[in-house]
């Protein structure tokens, strides 16, 4: 009689453990996707391409699964919030005001929702990206 509850308990623990590992793995891979998009944006240094790279990083991360989508949201929100703080300290000197932040967040959400990031791709951006 005690064998069945023991097996049930172990299977539940192992099942949750497997899901947790999958989520963490997806989150790590999603964070890497976000970093790769950021690195590509810096390397490309192409005018009006930031929304594309925001959408692409979020899209790639979200394709990993729930963990990737979570990582993309956390990283995107942290980036935008840190920009707001630096804008306050620099009195808007960075050129990333509230309007730009809202547009960035819209591109982030566009990508996370699975929509094509090429919607934001500027004309002339090299095919490498």
From Swiss-Prot:
Pfam families found in the cross-reference section: SAA (PF00277)
InterPro entries, A to Z: Serum_amyloid_A (IPR000096), Synovial_Prolif_Regulator (IPR052464)
Compartments, record wording: Secreted
Post-translational modification comment from the UniProt entry: This protein is the precursor of amyloid protein A, which is formed by the removal of residues from the C-terminal end.
Propeptide positions: 112-129
Keywords: Acute phase, Amyloid, HDL, Pyrrolidone carboxylic acid, Secreted, Signal
Name of the protein in question: Serum amyloid A protein
One Gene Ontology term, aspect cellular component: high-density lipoprotein particle
Lineage: Eukaryota, Metazoa, Chordata, Craniata, Vertebrata
Function: Major acute phase reactant. Apolipoprotein of the HDL complex.
Disease: Reactive, secondary amyloidosis is characterized by the extracellular accumulation in various tissues of the SAA protein. These deposits are highly insoluble and resistant to proteolysis; they disrupt tissue structure and compromise function.
Organism the protein comes from: Canis lupus familiaris (Dog)
Modified residues (Pyrrolidone carboxylic acid): 19
UniProt entry tagged with the keyword Glycoprotein: no
Induction: Upon cytokine stimulation.
GO biological process: acute-phase response
């Amino acid at each position: 009689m005690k064998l069945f509850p023991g097996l049930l308990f172990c299977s539940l623990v192992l099942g949750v453990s497997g899901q947790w590992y999958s989520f963490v793995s997806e989150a790590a891979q999603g964070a890497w996707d976000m970093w790769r998009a950021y690195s590509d944006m810096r390397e490309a240094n192409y005018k009006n391409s930031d929304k594309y790279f925001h959408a692409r990083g979020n899209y790639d991360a979200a394709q990993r699964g729930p963990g990737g989508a979570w990582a993309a949201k956390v990283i995107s929100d942290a980036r935008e919030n840190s920009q707001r703080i630096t804008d306050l300290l620099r009195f808007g000197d960075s050129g990333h005001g509230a309007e730009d932040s809202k547009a960035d967040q819209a591109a982030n959400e566009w990508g996370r929702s699975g929509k094509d990031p090429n919607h934001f791709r500027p004309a002339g951006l090299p095919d490498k990206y």
